[in-house]
């Protein structure tokens, strides 16, 4: 089942204006997941991704229902990690996939109005994503992070490259916290994706607010990518926000 056609442009506009993206599990460190999500969204998180690899299907589906309900309350976007079938079942706004060759299947499963995101790890992968039917990319990991064991850090160079060449909105990801977020923004990112910086904070709300303050302090004007985002999306033939 495709998402309602009228919702596609609205969701893409919300994606384009998003600044802070949180990935989280179904049971984050045995915390109350709904309380954590509500705190994070109150602090300024715009997008929630459910990324759960360990639990059974029934429990993941229950978590997805919670994520979707909370996101609807806060007018946030809800994305599912690596599972187009779950995204369709729980009526998520979209799916995030980790490999370029998974994009076409995700798009076919969810239809043209769903949001499809893709992980990229190099300048070459950023360029390759320009030709794929995705709505956003994540670029990283900028710094090593235990959430991606074995994945080497790529540094800030791919961020700067994406700011100049990516035709889709992009999020810097990997080891970002309030102490280094300004570096990522100064490299060209206008969107940040985090896990531990908000999930593991004593107050997710305060952590999200701190990240947004760091962003505001470093973002001294439009990104060089803004002009690229105003051009037609190659696969859709319309502007990414429309």
Region spans (language model):
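Non-cysteine beta-strand/loop elements that form the S-adenosyl-L-methionine
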Residues: 98, 135-142, 195
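Conserved N-terminal beta1-alpha1 strand-loop-helix module at the mouth
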Residues: 1-96, 103, 108-135, 151-154, ...
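Glycine-rich beta-strand-to-loop/alpha-helix junction loops that act as flexible
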Residues: 139, 172-176, 194-198
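C-terminal binding/interaction regions
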Residues: 187, 191-194
């Amino acid at each position: 089942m495709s998402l309602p056609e009228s919702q596609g442009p609205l969701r893409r506009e919300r994606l384009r204006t998003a600044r802070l993206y949180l990935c989280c599990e179904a049971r984050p460190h045995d915390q109350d997941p709904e309380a954590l999500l509500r705190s994070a969204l109150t602090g300024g998180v715009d997008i929630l991704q459910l990324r759960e690899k360990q639990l059974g299907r029934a429990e993941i589906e229950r978590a997805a229902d919670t994520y979707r309900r909370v996101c609807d309350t806060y007018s946030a976007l809800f994305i599912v990690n690596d599972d187009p079938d779950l995204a369709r079942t729980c009526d998520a706004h979209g799916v995030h996939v980790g490999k370029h060759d998974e994009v076409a299947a995700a798009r076919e499963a969810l239809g043209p109005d769903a949001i499809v995101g893709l992980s990229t790890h190099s300048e070459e992968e950023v360029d390759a994503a320009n030709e794929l039917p995705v709505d956003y990319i994540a670029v990283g990991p900028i710094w090593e992070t235990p959430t991606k064991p074995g994945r080497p850090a790529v540094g800030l160079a791919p961020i700067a490259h994406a700011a100049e060449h990516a035709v889709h909105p992009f999020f810097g990801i990997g080891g970002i916290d309030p102490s280094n977020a300004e570096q990522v923004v100064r490299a060209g990112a206008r969107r940040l994706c985090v896990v531990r910086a908000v999930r593991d904070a004593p107050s997710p709300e305060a952590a999200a607010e701190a990240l947004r303050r760091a962003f505001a302090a470093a973002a001294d004007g439009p990104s060089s990518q803004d002009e690229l985002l105003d051009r037609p999306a190659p696969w859709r033939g319309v502007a990414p926000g429309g």
